Amino acid sequence: MTLQDQIIKELGVKPVINPSQEIRRSVEFLKDYLLKHSFLKTYVLGISGGQDSTLAGRLAQLAVEELRADTGENYQFIAIRLPYGIQADEEDAQKALDFIKPDIALTINIKEAVDGQVRALNAAGVEITDFNKGNIKARQRMISQYAVAGQYAGAVIGTDHAAENITGFFTKFGDGGADLLPLFRLNKSQGKQLLAELGADKALYEKIPTADLEENKPGIADEIALGVTYQEIDAYLEGKVVSDKSRGIIENWWYKGQHKRHLPITIFDDFWK
C-alpha cells in the first residue's frame, strides 16, 4: 500500500460522492451525538464567512431543527462571529449567517484578548512573531467558543476536512481543537458540492480560501501558503495521479503535521519515531 493509499484510507475520502447522501450523513452524525449525550443541548461554531464554517454551520442548524421536531426538546445552534478588530470580509460573514440562519448569532471581538496576551508575553521578554500571533488568534477564538459552550450545555463543532487535515493546515488546539468534525472525510471540492446542494450562493464557496491570521500577509491565500492548489490536493485524496512536485509537497505536509492529528503524546505512542 502506498502512502497515498494509506492517507486516503485514514481520512475516509471517497473519489466520488452523492452530495445529498453526505449531507444526510453529517446531519445524522450531529443529531446522534447530542442524543447520545443527554446533558448536551447546544452546538457552537465560529463563523468566518468562508466555505468550511458556512457548510458546518448550516449542517448544525439543520441537525438541531430536526432534533427539536423529533423530540420536542430545546436544542439550539449558536453561531459566533469572532473578528480580530474589523474583519475585511465582514460582508461575506454576514452573508454566511443569512444562509445558515442560526438560532442565535453572537459577536465576540477577540482583539483585546489577543493584544493583551501579546503584551503580557512581551513584558516577560518573549517577543511574539506575526505568525505566532496568528496562532494566538486561532486559539483565542476556540477559548471563546468553549466558554460559550460551557454556559449553554454545548459542544464545539470544528471545520477540519480532508484537504485541511492532510496538510495540517490548522492551528493545534486552535481551530483544530473541537469536539466534532462533521466535514471529516470530505475534500475541498466535495464541500463545495454539499453547499451547492444546500442552495448556497456561489459566492459563499467560490471565494479564495484564506486563514487570514497574519497581519504582515493579510488575506494570504491558503494555496500560496501551502505551495500547492486545492485542486491538486483533492486529486491526490481521490487517488488520482498528481505531479511529483505536488505529491512531494503534500506528503511533506502530511508528515510535518502528524503531531496535530494526535492528542498529547504518551510513552506508548510511536507514530513520531
Swiss-Prot record:
Source species, domain of life: Bacteria
Catalytic class of the enzyme: ligase
GO molecular function: ATP binding; glutaminase activity; metal ion binding; NAD+ synthase (glutamine-hydrolyzing) activity; NAD+ synthase activity
Catalytic activity annotation: deamido-NAD(+) + NH4(+) + ATP = AMP + diphosphate + NAD(+) + H(+)
UniProt keyword Magnesium present: yes
EC number: 6.3.1.5
Pathway, per record: Cofactor biosynthesis; NAD(+) biosynthesis; NAD(+) from deamido-NAD(+) (ammonia route): step 1/1
GO cellular component, as recorded: cytoplasm
Family annotation (SUPFAM superfamilies): Adenine nucleotide alpha hydrolases-like
One Pfam family here: NAD_synthase
UniProt binding sites for ATP: G46, I47, S48, G49, G50, Q51, D52, S53, T159, K188, T210
Residues reported in the UniProt entry to bind Mg(2+): D52, E164
InterPro entries: NAD/GMP_synthase, NAD_synthase, NH(3)-dep_NAD(+)_synth, Rossmann-like_a/b/a_fold
GO biological process: NAD biosynthetic process
CDD domains on file: NAD_synthase
The keyword Magnesium is annotated on this UniProt entry: yes
Protein family (similarity comment): Belongs to the NAD synthetase family.
Subunit composition and interactions: Homodimer.
HAMAP family in the record: NadE_ammonia_dep
Function of the protein: Catalyzes the ATP-dependent amidation of deamido-NAD to form NAD. Uses ammonia as a nitrogen source.
Protein name, per record: NH(3)-dependent NAD(+) synthetase
